[in-house]
From Swiss-Prot:
Extracellular side: 19-531
SUPFAM superfamilies in the record: Influenza hemagglutinin (stalk), Viral protein domain
Gene: HA
Protein name: Hemagglutinin
Species for this entry: Influenza A virus (strain A/Gull/Astrakhan/227/1984 H13N6)
Family named by the database record: Belongs to the influenza viruses hemagglutinin family.
Topology in the lipid bilayer: Single-pass type I membrane protein
Length: 565
């Protein structure tokens, strides 16, 4: 037993004095958690939330270009030229338009703007225009300009600024004709309209002729309008009806008008100076002195995140809209806290026993123990490769989620309810697909990231094992017990891959033989002791069995002792 104690003491002394190097990874006090396909709430050293949830709460300039608020005017009132919207007539450029959903000044005369939703959508793609006179009112002939008390201008009857309502002059209304040739080299928006009286008496009073008509023609189409007599729900003291039409003329096109009653002739139109992505936002939030690269109807979004869940109808350089409120992408390692008491007398330990809280400037690294003390150093090369891989992952997610789908829901008003419903359903379906794809993609990437970190640590471990060859004992926990003395310079060669195992091969061979010899002697003594104990135990058992047999036979009368003197 004394030999065993001596052997154990020698072995313990050898273990304490041996130089060691361990491979490990960073651990922190981070509370970050991510989800993967197989696990939820996996602790990680760091992560990034890919979904933006905050906004400015205001309208901002978009990339330095200010928006235009239409004030008390609706889009229809502004574009047709309601006299109450005169202050907006000078608008030329905007990043986007803002319309108060309850603006009081729309079409001042009862009626409607044909294909209103399509025109709104067109203006969502216009960034600037200029207002220009198309046909002078005096060029049409012997007719008068009509006005209405429904369209007040500073207390007097007036009419739309961009149209001319022709009525009889001297109880005559001859056939009038007018033509506009688009020689601007740009697209031009032209508007005209038809007045539909409440009765034939009103029609004769205004236009004299029986069955008035209007003919509008271009080189590619022609349309004839007749008056639709009848009383309609009205407002502003009027019950007749005006329907306003529009056409976007391309360079070189001409448009001609012929009428003998009921025509609202074009006076001013709009030359489209610049197309671009825009929106007509409808909300009551205020305009602020701020700049953003992404604008929604609830506020600006300034972020570099991949996704946002603020609003689907966004304008500018915007993150993709998804329904998820949070998508966390792992950017660090699986966070395994260090074991507080580990190793012999608190010695260093490898990655199997947890992470290292003291690792600086790296995710993976080395910890060593020798006569000069204990040291720790990060492996910057493997860390940088991992960082590059994660950066690539984020960029790939952005690229994969970039699509050409744009919502058109915000461009339609209440007239096009069925279009709105269809747009909503399409938007919901597309958003569901984007949201599912985004979540699945992040879960997959989290799995890959954590697996990548595990692989990187094991690759580093294998790299050290291949370098040390037979000069060390792999302890199986991420550490190697060196069979030779290794100062700090020697440790550095192991870390940077310049270690020369042949230089220490002879010393290591002798050390290995010494350790194996001590273990063999210790094992022999143990075997001898076990043999003695086994022999004694077997003898005692045999004696006990014999005595028990004798006592049983005596009690049953089968055995008799005769004592002779």
């Amino acid at each position: 037993m004394d030999i065993q104690a001596v052997a154990l003491l020698i072995l313990t002394s050898t273990c304490v004095q041996a130089d060691r190097i361990c491979v490990g990874y960073l651990s922190t006090n981070s509370s970050e958690k991510v989800n993967t396909l197989l696990e939820n709430d996996v602790p990680v050293t760091s992560s990034v939330d890919l979904v933006e949830t905050s906004h400015t709460g205001t309208y901002c300039s978009l990339d330095g270009i200010s928006p235009v608020h239409l004030g008390d005017c609706s889009f229809e009132g502004w574009i047709v030229g309601n006299p109450a919207c005169a202050s907006n007539m000078g608008i030329r450029e905007w990043s986007y338009l803002i319309e108060d959903p309850s603006a009081p000044h729309g079409l001042c005369y009862p009626g409607e703007l044909d294909n209103n939703g399509e025109l709104r959508h067109l203006f969502s793609g216009i960034r600037s225009f200029s207002r220009t006179e198309l046909i002078a009112p005096t060029s049409w002939g012997a007719v008068n300009d009509g006005v209405s008390s429904a369209c007040q201008d500073r207390g007097a009857s007036s009419f739309y600024r961009n149209l001319v309502w022709f009525v009889e002059r001297g109880k005559q209304y001859p056939v009038i004709r007018g033509t506009y040739n688009n020689t601007t080299g740009r697209d031009v928006l032209v508007m005209w309209g038809i007045h539909h009286p409440v009765s034939t008496d009103e029609a004769r009073k205004l236009y004299v002729n029986n069955d008035p008509y209007t003919l509008v023609s271009t080189s590619s189409w022609s349309r004839k309008y007749n008056l639709e007599i009848g009383i309609r729900p009205g407002y502003n003291g009027q019950k007749s009806w005006m329907k306003i039409y529009w056409y976007l003329m391309h360079p070189g096109e001409s448009i001609s008008f012929e009428s003998n009653g009921g025509l609202l002739a074009p006076r001013y139109g709009y030359i489209i100076e610049e197309y671009g992505k825009g929106r007509i936002f409808q909300s009551r939030i205020r305009i602020a002195k701020c700049n953003t690269k992404c604008q929604t109807s609830v506020g600006g979004i300034n972020t570099n995140k991949t996704f946002q869940n603020i609003e689907r109808n966004a304008l500018g350089d915007c993150p993709k809209y998804i329904k998820s409120g949070q998508l966390k992408l792992a950017t660090g390692l699986r966070n395994v806290p260090a074991i507080s008491n580990r190793g012999l007398f608190g010695a260093i330990a490898g990655f199997i026993e947890g992470g290292w809280p003291g690792l600086i400037n790296g995710w993976y690294g080395f910890q060593h123990q020798n006569e000069q003390g204990v040291g720790m150093a990060a492996d910057k090369e493997s860390t940088q490769k991992a960082i590059d891989q994660i950066t690539t992952k984020i960029n790939n997610i952005i690229e994969k989620m970039n699509g050409n789908y744009d919502s058109i829901r915000g461009e339609f008003n209440q007239v096009e309810q069925r279009i709105n419903m269809l747009a909503d359903r399409i938007d919901d379906a597309v958003t569901d697909v984007w949201s599912y794809n985004a979540k699945l993609l992040v879960l997959l990437e989290n799995d890959k990231t954590l697996d990548m970190h595990d692989a990187n640590v094991r690759n580093l471990h294998d790299q050290v094992r291949r370098a040390l060859k037979t000069n060390a004992i792999d302890e199986g926990n991420g550490c190697f017990e060196l069979l030779h003395k290794c100062n700090d310079s020697c440790m550095e060669t192991i870390r940077n891959g310049t270690y020369n195992h042949t230089e220490y091969e002879e010393e290591s061979k002798l050390k290995r033989q010494e350790i194996e010899g001590i273990k063999l002697k210790s094992d022999d003594n143990v075997y001898k002791a076990l043999s003695i104990y086994s022999c004694i135990a077997s003898s005692i058992v045999m004696v006990g069995l014999i005595l028990a047999f004798i006592m049983w036979t005596c009690n049953s009368g089968n055995c008799r002792f005769n004592i002779c003197i």
